[in-house]
C-alpha cells in the first residue's frame, strides 16, 4: 500500500493538534456537590481531569445535605495544594457556614466545639458533625470564595443575576464602598431564583408577580452558568445554563466543559444514593439539553 506525502503530512498535523489541545486549558464547571464526594471523584475521573492543565470551577454549595461536606472541602484543598487552578464560587449554604464562623470565630479558632443544637438550628441536621471536622485551611478556603467568576464569555455564579446590579462580576467582592443596601443586593446573587418584573430583587417572603431571573437576563455578562436550582437535567434558557442536577437527591452530578477550541458540552455521573437529610423540592424542574 502506498502512502502519499499528503497523507503523512495530514497525520502529522492531526498529531500536533492533539498534543496542542492536550496541553491547552479546559474549563470544567461543577454543579452543586453538597457533600457528595464519591460522585465528585467519579465525575473528575470521567472527565480525565488534569490538575496541571485544567481550570476547575465550582458553582458553590460544597457543603450540607450530602454525607461528606467537610471531606469534600478537604479534597478541594488537596487539589489546590497539588497545583491545580481551582475556583470555588460561594453558594448560599457556604454563606451559612461563614455567618456561623463570623459569629463564633473565637470559639472555633480555639477549637472549642459549639453546642450541637446551635449547629443544627444554624446549619442543618449534620451541621454539628461538619463543623467539628473543619480545619483551619477549610475555613480559609471558605473565606476566600468569590461571589462570581468570569473567564472569556462565561460568568459563573451560584444563584442568579439582577439587571439592576450594574457592576461587573469580577468587581462584586470589591464592595466596601457600597451602601449596606447595595451589598445586600450583591449578596443576593447566591439566593436569587425570581425577580420582580422590573428586574429588582424581591423581599424574602415576596411571591406574587415574580418571574424567573433567566427570563430577564439580557446577556450582558455573556453565558451565565449557575447552580442553586435543582433540575432533572441541565437547564438551558437564553444565555443561561443551570447545572445543579440534584445529586444529593439521588439524581446526577454534572460538569459543563469548555474545550480549548471553545466547544461547550456537559458530562455527568449518577448519584450512588439519595443523600439529602431533607425533603426534595416539590418538583424538580425538567431541563433542556440543547443549545
Regions found by a protein language model. Give the residues of each.
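Divalent metal-coordination and catalytic microenvironments
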Residues: 32, 61, 91-92, 158, ...
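Active-site neighborhood of divalent metal-dependent phosphoester bond hydrolases
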Residues: 65-197
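Active-site environment of divalent metal-dependent phosphoester hydrolases
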Residues: 34-38, 64-67, 94-98, 149, ...
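A short acidic-Thr-Gly-centered motif at the start of a beta-strand
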Residues: 16-23, 48-49, 80, 147-150, ...
Amino acid at each position: 500500500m502506498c502512502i502519499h506525502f499528503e497523507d503523512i503530512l495530514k497525520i502529522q498535523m492531526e498529531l500536533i493538534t492533539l498534543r496542542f489541545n492536550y496541553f491547552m486549558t479546559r474549563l470544567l464547571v461543577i454543579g452543586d456537590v453538597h457533600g457528595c464526594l464519591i460522585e465528585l471523584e467519579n465525575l473528575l475521573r470521567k472527565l480525565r481531569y488534569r490538575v496541571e492543565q485544567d481550570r476547575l470551577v465550582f458553582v458553590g454549595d460544597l457543603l450540607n445535605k450530602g454525607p461528606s461536606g467537610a471531606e469534600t472541602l478537604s479534597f478541594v484543598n488537596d487539589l489546590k495544594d497539588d497545583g491545580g487552578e481551582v475556583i470555588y464560587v460561594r453558594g448560599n449554604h457556604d454563606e451559612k457556614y461563614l455567618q456561623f464562623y463570623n459569629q463564633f470565630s473565637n470559639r472555633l479558632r480555639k477549637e472549642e466545639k459549639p453546642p450541637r443544637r446551635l449547629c443544627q438550628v444554624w446549619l442543618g441536621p449534620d451541621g454539628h458533625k461538619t463543623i467539628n471536622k473543619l480545619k483551619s485551611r477549610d475555613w480559609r478556603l471558605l473565606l476566600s470564595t468569590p461571589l462570581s467568576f468570569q473567564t472569556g464569555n462565561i460568568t459563573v455564579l451560584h444563584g442568579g443575576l439582577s439587571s439592576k446590579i450594574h457592576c461587573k462580576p469580577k468587581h462584586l467582592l470589591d464592595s466596601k464602598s457600597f451602601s449596606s443596601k447595595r451589598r445586600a443586593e450583591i449578596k443576593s446573587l447566591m439566593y436569587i431564583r425570581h425577580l420582580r418584573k422590573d428586574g429588582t430583587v424581591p423581599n424574602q417572603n415576596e411571591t406574587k408577580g415574580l418571574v424567573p431571573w433567566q427570563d430577564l437576563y439580557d446577556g450582558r455578562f455573556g453565558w451565565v452558568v449557575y447552580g442553586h436550582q435543582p433540575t432533572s437535567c441541565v437547564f438551558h434558557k437564553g444565555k443561561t445554563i443551570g447545572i445543579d442536577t440534584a445529586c444529593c437527591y439521588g439524581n446526577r452530578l454534572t460538569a459543563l466543559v469548555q474545550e480549548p477550541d471553545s466547544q461547550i458540552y456537559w458530562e455527568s455521573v449518577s448519584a450512588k444514593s439519595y443523600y439529602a437529610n431533607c425533603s426534595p423540592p416539590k418538583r424538580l424542574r425538567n431541563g433542556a439539553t440543547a443549545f
